[in-house]
Regions:
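Flexible loop/hinge segments at secondary-structure junctions
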Residues: 2-4, 13, 36-38, 44-395
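Generic alpha-helix initiation/capping and coil-helix boundary signal
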Residues: 20-24, 40, 380
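Bacterial N-terminal signal peptides that target proteins for export
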Residues: 4-25
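C-terminal motif of bacterial Sec signal peptides marking the signal peptidase cleavage site
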Residues: 29-34
């Protein structure tokens, strides 16, 4: 694929079948802070079809066996992970009818706090634990489950293909320094494209979210001199701009952008089906090598590969705006299970170890039949092994 092409249609670019869950909100506690989010209804899963493992690479870690007794596992947290857990649960329960999984999308911050309190078995988070959280809860683990990405979308009728945007231009937009789509800075990145004089409407999250963390960290790493090297977080004070709008959750970002001509927004990739349904454009964004890329299987994998060797044993690492992958997509992250190493019973501990060992395995939950539905990518084999090693601490 020519990453500089301007005429590829969004629907033709990636043949992925994505889960559409309207109204889900993404919130998280990323390295510096915890977030809150609107709750999604709990779902208890019991039955579905078995996964296809065609084309899945063999994982180095084995899938563990759950206990023979009945165990009801509970999961809550990241609404970006919520669709994936809802795919995983029924299949796992079909294979092991004595194990059930009740899921809820309440935001990563809730997932972390509930796991820390021992109120649930598995917390789902779009981010690793902060140093303060680790200090407060030394037995809490963040276990990588899969890899996700964030899109930059816009509502610009009549403009086909994918506009190119870099972190400097995006930062200027959110600072109110670039106010029209035909601004010279945008035109320079998109020669030959007829840009309208439409007013730009920067859309941002008004709830604390990992999307805001990822987005603002991309700007801080790509434009440190102007945006600010430390101007990132789950909740930041965006510059006051008269045209700017706020929305809650990824679902809110999609719907608000869809009804606002001129909008630009940052949206989690598991909502790609909704962005396409609402005819939102998707930008090719500049990576650390200066190339413009879209988030697809190849570019997400390429970016992740640049961080594989540096991923620590506990999986806590930022993968934003790397400089080693020429065709890597620059806004990606690990998705995490937050689990207490010390469980209330050995039976529960065994069930957690078994389920999560299945979830991270290419012959189980990391199979394309699951991940492709939400736009996620599988863990590299070495990270699978690291996650498996962390699971052994759950007792």
């Amino acid at each position: 694929m020519d990453v500089h092409a301007q005429t590829t249609s969004p629907s033709a670019r990636r043949p992925r079948r994505l889960v559409t869950l309207g109204g889900l909100t993404l919130a998280g506690a990323l390295a510096l802070a915890a977030c809150s989010s609107t709750s999604s209804s709990p779902a208890t899963t019991k039955a579905s079809s078995s996964p296809s493992t065609t084309g899945a690479a063999s994982a180095t870690a084995k899938i563990l066996t759950p206990p023979s007794s009945t165990v009801a596992l509970t999961e809550t947290g990241s609404t970006l992970l919520y669709p994936l857990f809802n795919l995983w649960g029924p299949v796992y329960s079909k294979q092991y009818p004595n194990i059930t999984l009740t899921t809820a999308g309440t935001g990563s911050g809730t997932g972390i706090s509930q796991a820390a309190a021992g109120a649930i078995d598995i917390g789902a988070s779009d981010a690793y634990l902060s140093s303060s959280q680790v200090s407060a809860h030394p037995g809490l683990l963040n276990i990588p489950l899969a890899i996700s990405a964030q899109m930059i979308n816009y509502n610009l009728p009549g403009v086909s293909g994918h506009l190119k945007l870099d972190p400097t231009v995006i930062a200027r937009i959110y600072e109110g320094k670039i106010t029209a789509w035909n601004d010279a800075a945008i035109a320079k990145l998109n020669p030959g494209v007829t840009l309208p004089a439409t007013r730009i409407v920067p859309l941002h999250r008004i709830d604390g979210s990992c999307d805001t963390f990822l987005f603002s960290q991309y700007l801080s790493k790509g434009d440190p001199a102007d945006w600010g090297a430390n101007n990132f977080g789950t909740s930041i004070s965006f510059p006051p701009i008269s045209s700017a709008l706020g929305a809650t959750g990824n679902g809110g970002m999609v719907s608000e952008c869809a009804k606002t001509v001129g909008c630009i927004a940052y949206i989690g990739i598991s909502f790609e089906a909704q962005t396409q349904k609402n005819h939102l454009g998707e930008a090719m964004v500049a990576n650390g090598s200066g190339n413009y890329v879209l988030p697809d299987n190849a570019t997400i994998d390429a970016e992740a590969a640049g961080f594989t060797k540096s991923t620590p044993a506990n999986g806590a690492i930022s993968m934003i705006y790397g400089k080693t992958a020429a065709q890597g997509y620059p806004i990606i992250n690990y998705e995490y299970a937050i689990v207490n190493a010390k469980q209330s019973s050995s039976t529960t501990a065994q069930a957690i170890r078994a389920f999560l060992s299945w979830a991270i395995n290419a012959a189980g939950g990391n199979a394309p039949s699951f991940l492709s539905q939400v736009g996620f990518r599988p863990l590299p084999p070495s990270v699978v092994s690291q996650s498996q090693a962390q699971l052994q601490s759950v007792q």
